[in-house]
């Protein structure tokens, strides 16, 4: 079955790319980052290729490659272009597909459209990546409300942080959302340790066979 999943987050730097790499490896999935902001350092596609140990055929080219590491709307403006969401079409593939957003859920693509608006059009099940640190209950519940107000299918929340049982349980209960698991912070972020950590902390059946 051809599975398609969106990986988004409550904030930038939340760990979406590392989680996406682990998920791609576990599912044998193709990875697509529609918008890449910042090209001087290792891009998210390059990080996923390295950590997922994915072949070049499983890393699809970005729809927009922008030079400045900033919000997509600003990065595009500095590059003298405008991101046109209507030109971003979901790639066809016979393999599972993991789509990673840029920054947080409500990051603007241009002066009219947020990433969440694009996800609402696509109607693909989304995984919300969140911390379990102080302040995350508010951030995560607000993100869930924003997703549901747009009828974005929510697969569940994936925590990427040190353990905080009360916070994780509270979010799952008040947010009426599935707690998919928690990816701990790894001192040695090698492909092998990442794959092992994901396998220990998540159930692959929660992700496999999701199709829209």
Swiss-Prot record:
It holds the Pfam family AAA_26. SUPFAM superfamilies: P-loop containing nucleoside triphosphate hydrolases. Keywords: ATP-binding, Biotin biosynthesis, Cytoplasm, Ligase, Magnesium, Metal-binding, Nucleotide-binding. Its main location: cytoplasm. ATP binds at residues 13-18, 100-103, 160-161, 184-186. Mg(2+) binds at residues 17, 100. It is found in: Cytoplasm. It is an enzyme of class 6 (ligase). GO terms for molecular function: ATP binding; dethiobiotin synthase activity; magnesium ion binding. Its EC number is 6.3.3.3. Belongs to the dethiobiotin synthetase family. HAMAP family: BioD (MF_00336). Homodimer. PANTHER family: ATP-DEPENDENT DETHIOBIOTIN SYNTHETASE BIOD 2, DETHIOBIOTIN SYNTHETASE. This is ATP-dependent dethiobiotin synthetase BioD. It comes from Brucella abortus (strain 2308). The gene is bioD.
